[in-house]
Amino acid sequence: MNNYSEKFEKMRKAGSLASSTLDMITDYIKPGLSTNKIDELCYEFIKDNGGHSAPLYYRGFNKSICTSLNHVVCHGIPGERVLEDGDILNIDVTAILHNHYGDTSRMFTVGKPSVKSMNLINVTYESLMKSIKILKPGKKLGDIGHEIQTHVEKAWFSVVRDFCGHGIGDVFHQSPNVLHLSLIHI
């Protein structure tokens, strides 16, 4: 196996651990559970599977995952707040395995979310799928952002300009940065 194949395999395994962490936590997402407890469960799962949590102590962050509840866009800090019926929750997990990072997140609904919340979840998922569908050699990163922004704005939502997607590998946040907006408008 060449060096690139080895790196890709390590990234795949780290990504699989991060994804498995989200699979594990799914059954726990119910009203009454604190975001601190979600953090503890995810931390233990990652550790028990040979990994480490990348966010823990990263730039002073004192939790092992991010829990963004309702109006928190991203990088929410787990705490004593308990989940309530109707909440929407994004859990962002970054696992380190064999010195490589796997970074993913998933949106959860707690009980019965509002129609507006479900619309937001559906539109963001659709924009992700549309942006993945256009990927092929020769496409530019700006094409991805354009696809996302166009779809989101047609549904009367807006994109977050202060954060972006990023590459993974043997560094937590690395190139390329993938903006969620059209570079035509910058």
Where are these regions (language model features)?
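Active-site neighborhoods and metal-handling regions in enzymes and metal-associated proteins
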Residues: 1-184
